[in-house]
Every structure is written in C-alpha cells, then in structure tokens.
C-alpha cells in the first residue's frame, strides 16, 4: 500500500478512466493526506504508483502534473489563489509551470486561455485583468478549477471544491465533475457533505483514524452504510 510522511496507514487505491470516486470519513480521518500523497504534495515513504500498469515516480507535484494529474487543494486561500494576481494570471499558472517559465505564453495566448475558461465555467468577473481577490469565493474556486483544466489532466483530484461557496455554484461544480467523467476524465472528489458525495461518486473509500476501513459502491452508497463503515469499519478490512 501507499504510505506518506503525513502519518496515514498504508492504503491501496485505484481509479478507472471516466470514474468519479471519493474519500469519505470524519474530519481528521486522513482523506486529504491520501490525495496529497498521490499528487506528491506529501512525501511517499512506501508503496508504488502505477499508471496504465506501468510504475511512475512522483516525488513532487510537478512530477504528478507531468503524468496528467491535477489537484485542487482543500484551502484555496492558502494553497490556491494568488490574491494580487489577475484572474488571467491565476488561470494560466499551472499550464505555465508545465510549459516552463523560460517559455512564457504570449499575451494573446494568455488572454485566449483565460477567456476560454471564464466563458466555460461562467466566472463572474469584470474582466480577465481583475485581481482574483475581488471575486466571490465561488468564482475564485472556478478560477482554480479553470487553472487545472487548462493543463488537460487525465486525473483530477478535488479536495473540498464546494466548501464555503453558494448553492448555485456547488451544483454547477457537481454537474461539471459528472460531465468531465463522461468525457473520460478520472476524478477523485472529497467533501465533508456526504449527500454531495453520494450525488457525485460511483465508489467511496471510507476512512477512519488515518486508515482505509472500507469501500462502498452500487447499493451500498447510502448515508447509513457510510456511517456504519466509519463506526465499525475494521470488519471490512479483510475484503480488500
């Protein structure tokens, strides 16, 4: 199993093309630490990562990005937005990192990319030059989402993407996730709201005390089953 330096127990994990799965569990159960290990944001100390059957090495986020993995972090204020930069510069940031800072996008390219995602995600902003800090929380979150979609990932990890945003934007993000999956993208979705997870995910990995204690899919995807697995999850350990 995969293990990082963030104190999570070794865990096995897979995701299929076009699938939306999720990590669920109480706050502090280790959900974020699992995806941070996959993205290289925390150091992996044991286990292997494979893509299409071949082992890949991810020591840092840039390695993950080069493998087509994108990660929208839990705290957009700390790890996501760069407040003083414009909406445009925030959108192109990850793609520019992948492209290399010695090969900057032209002004025309930058505007084209920004306008494309402002339109696609219906980001409410006066212009692409507006500082991102002046946007609402929901629109800031859409900008970060646009930033990662611009890298054209094969696998998108969303950690609490709808926390602290209005209901309308929440529904838009959920619909977008399902649309991306239908187009072949693999998505891991983490939310503290179990009803949101049940609406969005076709498979749930249940965690307790920094350990995977069960996996639910199909008819098992109910609030009751999630809570039962969190409460008495050890008995599902042997089913892996």
PLM features: residue spans?
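Glycine-rich phosphate-binding loops of nucleotide-dependent enzymes
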Residues: 1-240
């Amino acid at each position: 199993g995969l293990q990082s330096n963030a104190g999570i127990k070794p865990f096995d994990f897979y995701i299929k093309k076009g699938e939306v799965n999720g990590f669920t569990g109480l706050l502090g159960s280790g959900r974020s630490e699992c995806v941070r290990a996959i993205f290289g944001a925390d150091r992996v100390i044991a286990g292997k990562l494979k893509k299409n059957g071949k082992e890949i090495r991810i020591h840092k986020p840039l390695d993950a990005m080069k493998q087509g993995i994108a990660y929208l972090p839990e705290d957009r204020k700390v790890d996501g937005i760069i407040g003083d930069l414009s909406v445009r510069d925030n959108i192109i940031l990850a793609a520019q990192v992948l492209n290399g800072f010695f090969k900057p996008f032209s002004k025309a390219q930058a505007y084209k990319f920004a306008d494309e995602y402002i339109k696609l995600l219906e980001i409410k902003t006066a212009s692409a030059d507006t500082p991102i800090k002046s946007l609402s929380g929901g629109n800031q979150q859409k900008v970060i989402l646009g930033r990662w979609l611009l890298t054209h990932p094969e696998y998108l990890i969303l950690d609490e993407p709808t926390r602290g945003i209005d209901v309308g934007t929440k529904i838009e993000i959920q619909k977008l996730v399902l649309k991306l999956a239908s187009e072949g993208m693999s998505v891991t979705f983490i939310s503290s709201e179990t009803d949101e997870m049940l609406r969005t995910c076709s498979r749930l990995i249940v965690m307790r005390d920094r350990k995977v204690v069960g996996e639910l899919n199909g008819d098992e995807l109910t609030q009751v089953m999630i809570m039962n697995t969190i409460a008495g999850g050890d008995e599902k350990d042997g089913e892996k």
